[in-house]
From Swiss-Prot:
Swiss-Prot/TrEMBL catalytic activity: L-seryl-[protein] + ATP = O-phospho-L-seryl-[protein] + ADP + H(+); L-threonyl-[protein] + ATP = O-phospho-L-threonyl-[protein] + ADP + H(+)
Family of the protein in this entry: Belongs to the protein kinase superfamily. AGC Ser/Thr protein kinase family.
The encoding gene: OXI1
PROSITE patterns noted in UniProt: AGC_KINASE_CTER, PROTEIN_KINASE_DOM, PROTEIN_KINASE_ST
Record's protein name: Serine/threonine-protein kinase OXI1
Binding site for ATP: L23, G24, R25, G26, A27, K28, G29, V30, V31, K45
Result of changing S235A: Strongly reduces catalytic activity
Amino acid sequence: MLEGDEKQSRALDFNRLEVLSLLGRGAKGVVFLVRDDDAKLLALKVILKEAIEKKKKGRESEDDEYKRVSFEQGVLSRFDHPLFPSLHGVLATDKVIGYAIDYCPGQNLNSLRKMQSESMFSDEIIRFYAAELVLALDYLHNQGIVYRDLKPDNVMIQENGHLMLIDFDLSTNLAPRTPQPSPSLSKPSPTMKRKKRLFRFTSFCNSGISPQESISVHSSSTLAVSDSSGEKSNSFVGTEEYVAPEVISGDGHDFAVDWWSLGVVLYEMLYGATPFRGSNRKETFYRILSKPPNLTGETTSLRDLIRRLLEKDPSRRINVEEIKGHDFFRGVDWEKVILVSRPPYIPAPDDGGDKGTDVNTKMDVENIVQEIFAARQEREKQSGDNNKNANMKIKDNTSGEWVKGLNNNHDLESDNNFLVF
């Protein structure tokens, strides 16, 4: 599936973890900031077993839910790439299951965008982040993984300023797009990181995580077809504003859905809003299926790239080779992107500090996860709305060094950021 064998994941012991704070919550899990016995900060995702078991009364069976959790852990255990997290261990108790990955101390791409005075990035900043997203998706596709949930909330910014994709519970296996090997992309050494500079940036970058829930109406069958990927999935998954037309229409989908989602992400980075959002899900899906994106402004290579990514016919949508050769990326050395030493923004150092939390035992963690799950169930029962963002604040990490031209002005109210795995 992925390069290399699946690594044997070490078992995590609550007694050897220092729980520092509650980072946030999502539809399936609660995330804690922890410090292990090597003093390394980790993001610990904890899932209530009861939440998984309740799924068998809904759209998925209990076995399917456990398979998705197992799939995500398996994928994480195989990653050896600078744009993806490493799996640092797994845990299981009578009440919860969970795993720990790299902690990104800053904001996610969505939070970083909202920190701009007009909630938009410059073309130059977009170029850097877009190049890393292209590399990340290309890596997944060459390993036979369709991501299926690309959105700014799932794009973290690491402490070194480079991106990190998270949240693979909606991903799936297909036959690899092509048999061609990926370039060597194991995590670079610190000395390599210092050497190269690709873009005309003069300062450093930041890291993060955030919200928006994902549609998980699963019909997880796989249909063999004679195209470049070898097969298609008929599952209906994704986040509604980023989901591709072929997912909505149910015609089967492959790796091209990720390039559509990249187009939505780039549009949002440029304009400050997604291109097809309606007043409700039905209207949003109608616009995705029938309306062209409104690419206002002068004709630029970025707008042309977005237009080609948001081609509704997946067979005509721009592919990875065409993306890398597009005018928007003219002059980009794809072998050196991940070696750039000074990305647009780097967060202030975070050693975990004194978070002032009373969450420090296995019982505390289990109780908090149970309480959050119970409160969520009650809200859903009262409102009937399964798509509300979680109401958990995360700490303000807006300090850091910004490249010239990347505005750090932001509204204090925008600090109500959310973390969803």
